[in-house]
From Swiss-Prot:
GO CC annotation terms, alphabetical: cytosol
Protein keywords: Cytoplasm, Lipid biosynthesis, Lipid metabolism, NAD, NADP, Nucleotide-binding, Oxidoreductase, Phospholipid biosynthesis, Phospholipid metabolism
Residues that bind sn-glycerol 3-phosphate: K111, G140, T142, K196, D249, S259, R260, N261
InterPro entries: 6-PGluconate_DH-like_C_sf (IPR008927), 6PGD_dom2 (IPR013328), G3P_DH_NAD-dep (IPR006168), G3P_DH_NAD-dep_C (IPR006109), G3P_DH_NAD-dep_N (IPR011128), NAD(P)-bd_dom_sf (IPR036291)
Single GO MF descriptor: NAD binding
Domain of life: Bacteria
NCBIfam families: PRK00094.1-1, PRK00094.1-2, PRK00094.1-4
Any GO BP: glycerophospholipid biosynthetic process
Stored Pfam families: NAD_Gly3P_dh_C, NAD_Gly3P_dh_N
Function: Catalyzes the reduction of the glycolytic intermediate dihydroxyacetone phosphate (DHAP) to sn-glycerol 3-phosphate (G3P), the key precursor for phospholipid synthesis.
Enzyme class: oxidoreductase
Organism field: Actinobacillus pleuropneumoniae serotype 5b (strain L20)
The protein's name: Glycerol-3-phosphate dehydrogenase [NAD(P)+]
Length: 336
């Protein structure tokens, strides 16, 4: 393996997905540093050599090292992979900005939009860091547990810098289990990963109400149409939404109960409140926050997104699930 591709990577974010990506990188033979914001919990990870809170019984590869000091974590690698909830993405960028050098390159696997603005995370990154650093985004149908277990997985990678994209593809890609597809549409890759969480809540609500497979499939299909319309308004490539970061991630998140967003929707459909559902899940439900941002972005762009709008009405305006279903089913007849 060449020195370029065996260069270390620092992963910021020691939740389930950040840990899984760190494991995958280290399993490929790359020195990988995993940082989290709670030193006492990182000390436990370092001692136990696994993340029992999120990925129990999956041992860390030898190449994975825990680093609880952010200054050291940034200094030890030129390539930084951010895997934190979207609502703290900007805060992490502000933390690392004074620690960055000219050689650093920034990638993220965070899926979401900026809180209260609906802006893409690329826009946030460029506003905070400027345009001097190569940026990349990793997105697609990936559940952390399966990735950490080494089960076959495929994902999309998009970057502002073709060399960065090529190098990270070779670094992450594993012929046995982890396939990485390059995509030059950063807007579409980011958008697909963010809005699918909202649609997954809708699919969960539908299933929680007992509406069945037909209704779930209709929601997925029309949800994809909404994502595609919003993407077109922002200049995304329509083909992106038929790929890993679009249809792939949408189907996975809407149909499997490993998805927190789907489980959250299921509980809502069964009559639980948003607060009760989130407490039971016990982890961040990105779609809850992204619903408001997706609705705001759709309003700003003048794009009709009835599924997103109805989920927004339910989560933030007190509309009940039965009225949401009635509103969607009672819409004016139209062509597909």
């Amino acid at each position: 393996m060449s020195e370029m591709y065996s260069a270390p990577v620092t992963v910021l974010g020691a939740g389930s997905y950040g840990t899984a990506l760190a494991i995958a990188l280290a399993r490929n033979g790359h020195k990988t540093y995993l940082w989290g914001h709670q030193p006492e919990k990182m000390a436990v990870l370092a001692t136990e050599r696994m993340n029992n809170a999120f990925l129990p019984d999956i041992a860390f590869p030898d190449a994975l090292e825990i680093e609880s000091d952010l200054v050291q974590a940034i200094a030890k690698a030129k390539d930084i992979l951010i895997v934190v909830p979207s609502h703290v993405f900007a805060d992490v960028l502000k933390q690392i900005k004074p620690l960055l050098s000219a050689h650093h390159r920034i990638m993220w696997a965070t899926k979401g939009l900026e809180r209260n603005t609906g802006r893409l995370l690329q826009t946030v990154a460029q506003e905070i860091l400027g345009n001097q650093y190569p940026l990349a985004v990793l997105s697609g149908p990936t559940f952390a547990k399966e990735l950490a277990q080494g089960l076959p997985t495929a994902i999309a990678l998009s970057s502002t810098d073709s060399q960065f994209a090529d190098e990270m593809q070779q670094r992450i890609h594993c012929a046995k289990a982890f396939r990485v597809y390059l995509n030059n549409d950063m807007i579409g890759v980011q958008l697909g990963g963010a809005i699918k969480n909202v649609i997954a809540i809708g699919a969960g609500i539908s299933d929680g109400m007992g509406f069945g497979a037909n209704a779930r499939t209709a929601l997925i299909t029309r949800g994809l149409a909404e994502i595609s319309r919003l993407g077109a308004s922002l200049g995304a490539n329509a083909n992106t939404f038929m790929g890993m970061a679009g249809l792939g991630d949408l189907v996975l998140t809407c149909t499997d109960n490993q998805s927190r967003n789907r489980r959250f929707g299921l509980m809502l459909g069964q009559g639980k409140s948003a607060e009760e559902a989130m407490a039971e899940i016990g982890q961040v439900v990105e779609g809850f926050y992204n619903t408001k941002e997706a609705y705001l972005l759709a309003q700003t762009q003048g794009v009709e997104m009835p599924i997103v709008e109805q989920i927004y009405q339910m989560l933030f305006c007190g509309k009940n699930a039965h009225d949401v279903a009635t509103s969607l089913l009672g819409r004016e007849r139209k062509g597909e």
